[in-house]
Amino acid sequence: MGQKVNPTGFRLGIIKDWTSRWYDDSPVISEKIKQDHVIRNYVLARLKREKAGIARIVIERTTKHVKINIYAARPGAVVGRKGEEINNLSQELTRITGKEVKIDVVEVIKPEIEAQLIGDNIAYQLENRVSFRRAMKQAIQQAMRAGAEGIRIRCAGRLGGAEIARAEQYKEGKIPLHTIRANIDYASVTAHTIAGTIGIKVWVYKGEVLVQRIDAIEEDEMKRMKDRRADSKSRPRDPRSKRRRSRTKRA
């Protein structure tokens, strides 16, 4: 199943966290989920013109306000001159949600290994008639130079304007999809070209997480087992237990 399931959903609650971090058991929960979808689409559409490079948008809710964390490769494009862009964005989102909106912009340190940004970059190049092989290979080289342990990119559709659709993929390093502790960043992007739409999927392996914690748990368990064995050997045996064994054998 590791090869089929979405790598992010497969690891949610273990090493990955949700992008909507709030809880509600009221009947209007569906409206809030729909509102999150509207917020994300609006922010992405507005900041796409600024070429801010949005990796992900995390939404947190309380009873009084909505907090939005925007992870961007170019945070200056989100903030704007003297904070004009972020203030206008906050006002528009307040109008949409009906609550006070607080926006925090977080800079993405290594955009070369963010799956969403890689997919967006390849889609942009394909829409501008760049060779798909060249775009894929350049993205792989940049990701491996930036510190990724493995990357796989798959493009499917009318590649190069061909009449028959096909799929091609390139891979470098390792992508352990079955290992739950493996931190794999995944993104799916659609490029709208003259020949039609091209689907782009990106897997980036950034290394293992929880390794130290798992090793510590295993060491503690081994230590406990050794202590139990030592205690059992040091305890004097009850002579009555031998008598009971002999009686059971005679019976």
UniProtKB/Swiss-Prot annotation:
GO biological process: translation
Annotated Pfam families: KH_2, Ribosomal_S3_C
Spans through the membrane: none
Keywords for this protein: Ribonucleoprotein, Ribosomal protein, RNA-binding, rRNA-binding
Biased composition range(s): Basic residues: 240-251
Bias (Basic and acidic residues): 221-239
Chain positions covered by the region annotation Disordered: 221-251
One GO MF term: mRNA binding
GO cellular component, one term: cytosolic small ribosomal subunit
Classification via SMART domains: KH
Residue ranges of every copy of the KH type-2 domain listed in the record: 39-109
Family recorded in the similarity comment: Belongs to the universal ribosomal protein uS3 family.
Function statement: Binds the lower part of the 30S subunit head. Binds mRNA in the 70S ribosome, positioning it for translation.
PANTHER family assigned to the protein according to its UniProt record, in alphabetical order: 30S/40S RIBOSOMAL PROTEIN S3 (PTHR11760), SMALL RIBOSOMAL SUBUNIT PROTEIN US3C (PTHR11760:SF19)
Subunit structure: Part of the 30S ribosomal subunit. Forms a tight complex with proteins S10 and S14.
Name of the featured protein: Small ribosomal subunit protein uS3
Native organism taxonomy: Bacteria, Pseudomonadati, Chlorobiota, Chlorobiia, Chlorobiales
